[in-house]
Amino acid sequence: MPCEVPARRIFSEFCEHEGMALKFTISYREDSLDVFRYYKKLAEGAMVQVTDEQLFTPLDEEANSIAVIVKHMAGNMRSRWTGFLTSDGEKPDRNRDSEFVDPPGAREALMQLWDHGWHCVFSAIEPLSDADLTRTVTIRGEPHSVMQAINRQIAHYADHVGQIVLLAKHFQHANWKSLSIPRNKSADFNQKVRTREISQR
């Protein structure tokens, strides 16, 4: 006779599976938000160290200034995250090429643009349910799972934040205050993480 699995066991295993899936999706959403917040903070820690002039200064004619990178990121954020689940990520009113010229002329206006872009990011991701993470969205008509779309933007923003940090460090030279592990301080950092004095996340 074929083995029969008690209904109670089936139900228990189903609940365990569903619980694990829910924990995974919640963890993914929260981890993604933490990564986005980390890169936002990293860029802001770099930008606060440069002068207003340096904020708008490119290294050469083909390079982007920090201000241009910020304008591009903000434009991308508005396009990708507005109506994230219900509309294409490349909005018809977006003019991507214009994001690389004529940034706002003052730091305050630039940071308002920056903050609005990040508001779009967090407002789209924070309410996502576990069911939402299984959905499909499009970018330029190309299908992406919600997780793929989030991962894509994490990688994109990390790339540009790295550029911002590099430019700021270049301009500040010896006055630069490290935003990661200071040179020759790896052992100290490792010990502080192990003793829970600080977190590396």
Q: What is each PLM-predicted segment?
A:
Residues 8-9:
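Basic polycationic patches enriched in arginine
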Residues 101-137, 144-159, 163, 201:
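Acidic/histidine-rich alpha-helical segments that form the ligand environment
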Residues 36, 40, 47, 114, ...:
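Hydrophobic alpha-helical core bundles mediating ligand binding, dimerization, or RNAP-core interactions
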Residues 29, 33-37, 44-47, 52-98, ...:
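Short, contiguous alpha-helical
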Residues 19-34, 101-102, 109:
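Short, charged, low-complexity loops and linkers
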